[in-house]
């Protein structure tokens, strides 16, 4: 279910303050955040945001086609190791 248009996109206030501070100083270091629920705004384009995935901070470089998506979509929380192989099939 999509968010109502009249409400606008959700961005955590502390993340927005960090982005404004980085834009003012033109710092190239990644912005560390735990806010996976924040929507990517056009102001974020060109910045690197380190999004927490539950264990580490994954650096995400924000490009133009990411606008409107959530930060958590680009920082995967689960690692897929593959399905267990059938031992009988390997012997043949």
UniProtKB/Swiss-Prot annotation:
GO BP field: ribosomal small subunit assembly; translation
HAMAP family recorded: Ribosomal_uS19
MF GO annotations: rRNA binding; structural constituent of ribosome
Family: Belongs to the universal ribosomal protein uS19 family.
GO cellular component terms, A-Z: cytoplasm; small ribosomal subunit
Source organism per UniProt: Chromobacterium violaceum (strain ATCC 12472 / DSM 30191 / JCM 1249 / CCUG 213 / NBRC 12614 / NCIMB 9131 / NCTC 9757 / MK)
Swiss-Prot/TrEMBL keywords: Ribonucleoprotein, Ribosomal protein, RNA-binding, rRNA-binding
Amino-acid biosynthesis listed as a keyword: no
Name of the molecule in the record: Small ribosomal subunit protein uS19
Summary of the function given for this chain in its UniProt record: Protein S19 forms a complex with S13 that binds strongly to the 16S ribosomal RNA.
SUPFAM superfamilies listed in its UniProt record: Ribosomal protein S19
Gene3D superfamilies, alphabetized: 30s Ribosomal Protein S19, Chain A
Pfam families: Ribosomal_S19 (PF00203)
Domain of life where this protein originates: Bacteria
InterPro entries assigned: Ribosomal_uS19, Ribosomal_uS19_bac-type, Ribosomal_uS19_CS, Ribosomal_uS19_SF
